Amino acid sequence: MREDRSMKKYIFPIIAIVLGCSSCDSFLEKTPKDRLVPETYFKTENDLKMFSNSFYDNLLDKTPYDEQSDVMFEKGTISDELLGGTAREVPQAAASGGWSWGQLRKINTMLGHMDQCTDAEVAKQYTGLAKFFRTQFYFQKVMRFGDVPWYDKELGSRDSSLYKARDSRELVMSNMLNDIDDAIESLPSGKSVYRVNKWAALMLKAQFCLYEGTFRKYHNVTLPGHSAEDYLKLAYQAAEQVMNSGVYSLASDYHELFREPDADQNEYILAIRMEQSIGCTHSATSYVAMNTGGNPGFSKKFIDSFLMKDGTRYTDKPDWETKLFVEEVADRDPRLGMIIRLPQSIRVNSKKTIYGPELTMTSTGFQLEKFVMDPQYETAERANMSFNDIPVYRLGEAYLMFAEAKAELNILTQEDVDNSINKLRDRVGMPHLVLAGLTVDPFLTSETYGYQNLAKLNPSNLAQILEVRRERTIEMALEGRRWNDIVRWKEGATWTEPLYGMYFPGPGAYDLTGDGNADVYLYATAKVDNAVKKQYGDNFTYLQIQEIEIDGKYVPYSDGIILSEGTKGFVAMHYKKARAFDESRDYLYPIPSGDRQLNPNLAQNNGWADGLDF
């Protein structure tokens, strides 16, 4: 399951790190809760700060990778969510699979004792902080499970409310709106990249309102209270406040923004701080640069969505699907070369100089570059040793949420685009998005690669919505948004689209660096021909094109490569893995059967069979 895999695998060993790494020595570790007497605590700012440090732990699911999505996946395995069907099961253990509530109990405990604080202004600020985290906690729960029980006070072990049914989605969302508005009013407005402030609260509001507005729109959900349009309006208004605050500005270099050790305090609104000296690290670089790191790669679909640097569509070119790598990535949106390794990419460390992508280190040939630290920080290439800060919210996302909410309401103007998306394009030297004369991109609506649900709905401003989605997918790549974007847009069919990579027309030598010399040789025989080895030498990359099936049995790769059409086609390491998506079931996760046994009033989400008949 996504929540269980994410930070354990990609961020750092299981230590209690929070923003600023403060929980490494937090009060909650020094003083276990069974020795904390609430009635005599929560009196000073230091009490509140130390207790609330652990709230930041909940931000740690903000991974630097979309490790299960249609745009990026690993070489050896793909997630249960991408496999779908019987690969997805109802968890049995109580409090597993994301159905855990300990963090909420801590938040409600502090709120319940806030009147003990002797400083009214401090109490107001920390009330706002707690309500921010309660909103964030419930946002994660609603995205994962839909209806959930709402609790706004600490409950005793015998309280009957522990066994109540799930509350309606609208009740929970309305309470979240009340909480986040209190947080916006109460939190400080100064920059504090490692601590929650007013602007982080506005980003959270924009984020969950955009999610809810689009979820209700595309899933056709109508509930008493707020409408989809209400949430979309709240989303763009919150994002606009951040945009117009004058507090933040875009960093000048998109590439460096994600690989510098310290968070850019102009663009980053809230970040997870990493500190190598005390072991607060993650594995973004080693995940890409080591054989044991997962060997992730971007899908061809993602690469093909990038425009040419002159603003025209790559997929309008003749034979676009079967162009070789060097030609395929030439003259594209400059962000492509900041997100993947291009032919001219050079990486130097103490062991070797690496040119272009390393085909053996990626599932598709399209090797990740974003979040990979500069080679000068060589220790980052060791397992779990990257120390560049991870963004939670940044100004670039505010621009995208603003534009998307307005597009979904069909009120997006050229002025809106110039104040949002075109600022992101200006940063990398891309031509502006111009709404006048905009036409639908067939690639983005195709059955093979496109948004099929949106294409069927065919709204009057289809072209606008598609271009906003293109921009979001590119700009926010690897920032942990893609899965939930697909859910809220009701585009689950994209998870069954082909997981393809680079195209190779057959065995032979291929240039991946654009210098006219071969870098890799693909062969479809039992071993490399001696004449070929003599020509290219031993210090060269040879990859066997492996048979997908032999005598009716699927043969997995070892050090070879699988192509979609046998000895030619797209890199397709997961070609024979059956994948499915159940539109009636898979947009929500199941509640663990153990929790339903403890509380029979909890109804199971539709389509999830757990063997419990009540």
Pin down the residues of each PLM region.
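C-terminal motif of bacterial Sec signal peptides marking the signal peptidase cleavage site
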Residues: 21-23
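An aromatic- and glycine-enriched ligand-binding surface/loop that stacks and positions planar moieties
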Residues: 25-82, 173, 181-182, 195-202, ...
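Conserved, well-structured interaction surfaces
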Residues: 45-53, 57-61, 79-145, 160-195, ...
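Long, intrinsically disordered, low-complexity segments
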Residues: 100-101, 175, 259-307, 425, ...
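Short coil/turn linking the two alpha-helices of tandem helical-hairpin repeats
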Residues: 142-144, 149, 191, 211-220, ...
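C-terminal substrate/ligand-recognition segments
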Residues: 329, 333-427, 578, 583-614
